[in-house]
Amino acid sequence: MAERLSPADIEAQLANLPGWKQVGDRLEQTFTFKDFLGSIAFVNRLVDPAEQAGHHPDLSISWNRVTVCLTTHDVGGITQKDIDLAKVISNLAVV
């Protein structure tokens, strides 16, 4: 089982994750696209990496915006799994 990161570890990791912020016990970022199709294409791109990691984000889609929230539910907070998936998702948003 993954271990929760300390507040200092989270802060240090967020320095390398532009646009991501800590909101309570999760990481969050809202990505903006040209239109709804861009939003859905982004969501479709993140499905395979999330499945491969066995770690699934909470998503909110609103026309040209997708808000991604990451937390490790079984430990009740942010773990390295969240940081790693945030990096992958950030790379997927650049098209």
Swiss-Prot record:
What keywords does the record list, in alphabetical order? Lyase
Q: Which PANTHER family match?
A: PTERIN-4-ALPHA-CARBINOLAMINE DEHYDRATASE
Q: Which family does it belong to?
A: Belongs to the pterin-4-alpha-carbinolamine dehydratase family.
- Please indicate if the UniProt record lists Repressor as a keyword: no
Q: What's the Enzyme Commission number for this chain?
A: 4.2.1.96
Which top-level enzyme class is recorded in the Swiss-Prot or TrEMBL entry?
lyase
BP GO terms, sorted: tetrahydrobiopterin biosynthetic process
> What one GO molecular function would you report for this record?
4-alpha-hydroxytetrahydrobiopterin dehydratase activity
Q: Does the keyword Lyase apply?
A: yes
Instruction: Return the InterPro entries for the record.
Output: PCD_sf, Pterin_deHydtase
Organism, by scientific name, is Thermosynechococcus vestitus (strain NIES-2133 / IAM M-273 / BP-1)
Give the reactions, separated by semicolons, that this protein catalyses: (4aS,6R)-4a-hydroxy-L-erythro-5,6,7,8-tetrahydrobiopterin = (6R)-L-erythro-6,7-dihydrobiopterin + H2O
A Pfam family that this protein carries is Pterin_4a
The identity of this protein, by name, is: Putative pterin-4-alpha-carbinolamine dehydratase
